């Protein structure tokens, strides 16, 4: 499977952070995002070809994170702390506008059959 583009990673990363309370450790994002994109463990552990011994997937997520910082959706490392990715107020607003979570209460008891109205 081919890796998604950096641009394709940005919104799922923003929503992943939002859905986990707005602040996460960087290392906790790589695997869940990889699963969103259908990457296998093997694909997520392919190393960069530059002899730095860093997974290519982690590097791609970090670049997407940098773009979110540039958009002012995430705090930079000086503001949030090294290894912590934290949404800004603008990032929270953006995530809320994109979020598909629905806060709907469903009744516990739903009749199994419904009667159709009779036509006279």
Annotated model-derived regions:
Residues 2-4, 34-62:
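Short, positively charged loop/turn segments that connect secondary-structure elements
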Residues 31:
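Basic nucleic-acid-binding interfaces
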Residues 36-40, 71, 101:
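Conserved, well-folded catalytic cores of nucleic-acid-processing
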Residues 65-66:
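Short, hydrophobic-biased segments on the C-terminal half of alpha helices
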Residues 69-79:
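A short, conserved structural fragment
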Residues 89-120:
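Short, amphipathic alpha-helical interaction segments positioned at domain boundaries
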């Amino acid at each position: 499977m081919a890796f998604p583009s950096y641009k394709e990673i940005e919104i799922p990363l923003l929503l992943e952070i939002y859905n986990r309370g707005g602040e996460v450790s960087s290392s906790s994002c790589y695997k869940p995002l990889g699963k969103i994109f259908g990457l296998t463990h093997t694909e997520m552990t392919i190393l960069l070809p530059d002899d730095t011994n860093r997974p290519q997937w982690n590097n791609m997520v970090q670049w997407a994170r940098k773009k979110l910082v540039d958009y002012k959706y995430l705090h930079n490392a000086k503001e949030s702390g090294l290894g912590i990715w934290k949404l800004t107020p603008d990032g929270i607003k953006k995530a809320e506008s994109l979020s598909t979570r629905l806060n709907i209460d469903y009744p516990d008891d739903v009749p199994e059959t419904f009667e159709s109205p009779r036509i006279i």
